[in-house]
A protein has these predicted regions:
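Metal- and O2-centered redox machinery and metal/ROS homeostasis
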Residues: 1-171
Length: 171
């Protein structure tokens, strides 16, 4: 999609996650089996992300703005829950990216896209679908792996209000 007139604007090398994800998997050891919700998510990406610019941007938007918003809290929360120190949650670290500034830049790019109404509708529908796919993946991961979390006595019992959240994620 890098060559597409509208979707190409959303290809950012600094968001590349494969090296971080590979490092996390190496650190964590054996690869767990792929869960059905993850397979469904991957199938959807393969179906739409290579030849439908609005769908590509919809999934890109959902993934990266989520990672640069709540993901900035989720990464440290996972590290606390599983007793990780540095390795094992690098997927959530974006070196050289200032999340609030990046989110602003991203939204400005979205505001400038000039898709016809059918592609605008596709974008909105695909964002909704991407959210649902993400929710299904997280639900399956919770069901499969939540019991493996370790209780960190230094972690607050209920940190969902934002205490302990990185300051850039709060903006």
């Amino acid at each position: 999609m890098a060559d597409d007139p509208s979707a190409g604007a959303f290809v950012f090398p600094e968001l590349t996650r494969l090296p971080a994800l590979a490092a996390d998997l190496r650190f964590l050891g054996d690869s767990p089996p792929v869960l059905p919700a993850t397979e469904a998510y991957c199938d959807r990406l393969l179906e739409v992300a290579f030849d439908r610019p609005a769908a590509f941007v919809a999934h890109h938007y959902t993934r990266y703005l989520g990672d640069l918003s709540g993901g900035q809290y989720l990464g440290p929360a996972i590290a606390r829950a599983y007793g990780l120190d540095g390795d094992g949650h690098r997927f959530f670290v974006f070196p050289g990216v200032h999340p609030p500034a990046f989110r602003t830049r991203y939204r400005e790019l979205l505001d400038r896209v000039t898709w016809p109404s059918d592609e605008q509708d596709e974008f909105l529908a695909e964002v909704s679908r991407a959210y649902q796919l993400n929710i299904a993946v997280l639900a399956e991961l919770k069901e499969k792996w939540a019991d493996r979390a370790v209780r960190n006595p230094a972690a607050p019992d209920d940190d969902i209000a934002g205490e302990g959240m990185p300051s850039e994620a709060q903006s």
